[in-house]
Structures are given as structure tokens and as C-alpha cells.
């Protein structure tokens, strides 16, 4: 992706996948916008195929425990854990995005809606995921700073 100039977009994809707990991202699950005349790749396609995000198979409130059994059984397909992947992909832009997403709440729809308990549980999971990513990033940043200071 770096050769195509899409490194930032790929990083953003993995960070967003972590926040929404997308269990179905894999090497064949993203796309490109291609110029039909030249067949040149112009950009990454907007993110799509999130039907395995937001814990779709969790049926009971107990399954929404952060890092619990559901997470072990329905984790990411790339890597073992969303958090380290997201931390490795953080940039100033994605870090700011996560900070701005703190406190996110779903907008309820009058006709198409999930039960209130589920929406609240999903909001909590997303908040916990954001906090875990940012906390791990803070630890990682401190470790890097300490290592650099040790060399001086």
C-alpha cells in the first residue's frame, strides 16, 4: 500500500475496524477506485462490508463484556487483537479522530432501531476500545521516549 501512496488510508481503516470491532477485515476485504479508461488505481474505495462489526452475534448483555468470551471467539481476522493493530496504525490524524469520538452516542431512529440496552452496550464497548487504544498508545509513546532518553 505504501507503494501506491495509500498508507494513511490503510492505517485509518485498521483504526476504524478496531473501534467498530470489525471481525471480517482480511486481505480480500477492501477495494480501490479504478479509472475505467486507463485501468489505473486512483484511490482506495470508501470503507465497506461492515456486516461483522458491532458484535452482530452477541445476543445477551453479558456477551458485551470488553475483552470477554465473545471477543475471544469473534476477534479480528488480521492479528489476534484489535488494540495492538490500531495502536501500530495511529497517526496524529487518527489519534485526533479517536479523541473526538470519545463520548460518541448512536442517534436513535424511530423505525429502524436496536433495543436501548444493545445500543448502550455498543456505545460502552466503543468507548472502552477507544480508551484502550489511546491508553496503549500513551504507554507506547512513553516507552519510546524513555528508550531515546537512555541513549543520551
What are the roles of these predicted feature ranges?
Residues 1-22, 26-27, 31-152:
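Anionic ligand-binding catalytic core segments
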Amino acid at each position: 500500500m505504501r507503494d501506491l501512496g495509500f498508507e494513511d488510508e490503510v492505517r485509518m481503516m485498521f483504526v476504524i475496524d478496531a473501534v467498530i470491532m470489525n471481525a471480517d477485515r482480511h486481505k480480500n476485504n477492501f477495494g480501490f477506485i479504478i479509472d475505467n479508461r486507463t485501468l489505473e488505481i486512483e484511490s482506495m474505495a470508501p470503507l465497506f462490508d461492515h456486516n461483522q462489526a458491532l458484535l452482530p452475534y452477541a445476543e445477551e448483555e453479558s456477551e458485551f463484556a470488553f475483552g470477554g468470551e465473545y471477543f475471544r471467539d469473534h476477534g479480528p481476522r488480521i492479528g489476534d487483537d484489535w488494540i495492538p493493530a490500531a495502536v501500530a496504525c495511529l497517526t496524529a490524524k487518527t489519534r485526533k479522530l479517536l479523541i473526538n469520538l470519545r463520548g460518541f452516542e448512536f442517534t436513535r431512529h424511530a423505525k429502524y432501531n436496536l433495543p436501548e440496552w444493545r445500543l448502550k452496550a455498543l456505545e460502552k464497548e466503543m468507548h472502552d476500545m477507544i480508551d484502550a487504544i489511546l491508553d496503549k498508545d500513551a504507554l507506547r509513546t512513553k516507552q519510546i521516549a524513555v528508550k531515546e532518553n537512555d541513549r543520551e
